[in-house]
């Protein structure tokens, strides 16, 4: 090999030789990475199919056990209960395992994102995404408080109201997408606390299309005051729930992917019961909003379809929030009473 010429060109050639050596190392590392990736994909497929088979057999076993349980002799009942508990425990273990395996997206994620794999494969990535979701909720809640306050007390313009409602639509749409991704990654948020964000998205969309007029102005201040109060309560919930979840996770009593919610769950009983009056007041305000809208719909001057279409979601939100919270409180009192009787 000829010696490199002197001057800047020689320096460039020497740098190129060093880069060439590094590039060969990168190529080898990338080759190994692709091999490991193929091995990982095979392991994922094998693990997924094995879990699916096991879950199917567990369901069949649980069904047989349920059918034969009434006819079992009294001495076998304890063994049957023990087997039932073991089956439930195994199903919980499979749930944790599946959080680290690729899975098909649900209907909503498929419609929004297509067939993209949204499963995060490491604990660090899952926790980072969950933490980013919580921060997103906190920052947007503060922004919503400020904007609703501005619209309520400083500006009376349909344009700023529309911007506020558009922000609400975007916020709730984004929440539903992020929550669906978190559920795919092992978060245990479910039931009403997921569904009520879809209802809120619909409600905000209808509010966005409501034209300015007499009916809108009659409901405007009440809605903005409610939005301000709701965002304030959500801020309180995030602040106190995040601290409570941190303590419970440190004690091993909560899952690492558990999220703060805009309601009350059983794990909040210790330390967060002071939030209940704020929550119930907000629930009844939703009922008041629904009744106000139904009353406006009866006004002969009411021509907008948005009045009724906002009333029904507010009523649904009240019923879902109120009875879900009430069920948690009733269940806790029942468990405490049952525990004290045993003692």
From Swiss-Prot:
Protein's UniProt keywords contain Membrane: yes
Disulfide bonds: none
Name of the molecule in the record: Transmembrane protein 120A
Residues in the Cytoplasmic compartment per record: 1-132, 178-190, 241-270, 331-343
Predominant localisation class: membrane
Extracellular topological intervals: 153-158, 210-218, 295-304
Annotated CoA binding sites: 130, 187-188, 237, 240-241, 283, 332
Subcellular location: Cell membrane; Nucleus inner membrane; Endoplasmic reticulum
Its biological purpose: Multifunctional protein involved in mechanosensation, and plays an essential role in lipid metabolism and adipocyte differentiation. May function as an ion channel involved in sensing mechanical stimuli. Mediates the mechanosensitivity of the PKD2-TMEM120A channel complex through direct physical interaction. TMEM120A seems to affect mechanosensation by inhibiting PIEZO2 channels, possibly by altering cellular lipid content.
Family affiliation: Belongs to the TMEM120 family.
Gene: TMEM120A
Domain notes: The transmembrane domain (TMD) has structural homology to the very long chain fatty acid elongase 7, ELOVL7, despite low sequence homology between them.
Native source species: Bos taurus (Bovine)
Subunit structure: Homodimer. Forms heterooligomer with TMEM120B. Interacts with PKD2; TMEM120A inhibits PKD2 channel activity through the physical association of PKD2 with TMEM120A.
Gene Ontology terms: biological process: detection of mechanical stimulus involved in sensory perception of pain; fat cell differentiation; monoatomic ion transmembrane transport; protein heterooligomerization; protein homooligomerization
